[in-house]
Amino acid sequence: MGHANIWYSHPRRYCQGSRSCRACSNRHGLIRKYGLNICRQCFREYAHDIGFKKLD
């Protein structure tokens, strides 16, 4: 049993380790509001395509 088998062998059903960005699979800076599940970097890139508009 090598290091790779042991390191991520525990099941991740909840908490930060179980969620990732749907665009880039990043786990940091995740926006979960409204069921987006997208990281903040990808949100800035795809916000207009999703339908968010910047207010002046």
From Swiss-Prot:
The keyword Cell inner membrane does not apply. Pfam families: Ribosomal_S14. Binds 1 zinc ion per subunit. Its cofactor is Zn(2+). One of its GO terms (cellular component) is ribosome. One of its GO terms (molecular function) is structural constituent of ribosome. Signal peptide: none annotated. It is found in: Cytoplasm, Cytosol; Cytoplasm; Rough endoplasmic reticulum. It comes from the Eukaryota. The keyword Disulfide bond does not apply. Zn(2+) binds at residues 21, 24, 39, 42. GO terms for biological process: cytoplasmic translation. Keywords: Cytoplasm, Endoplasmic reticulum, Metal-binding, Ribonucleoprotein, Ribosomal protein, Zinc. Component of the 40S small ribosomal subunit. Belongs to the universal ribosomal protein uS14 family. This is Small ribosomal subunit protein uS14. It comes from Lonomia obliqua (Moth).
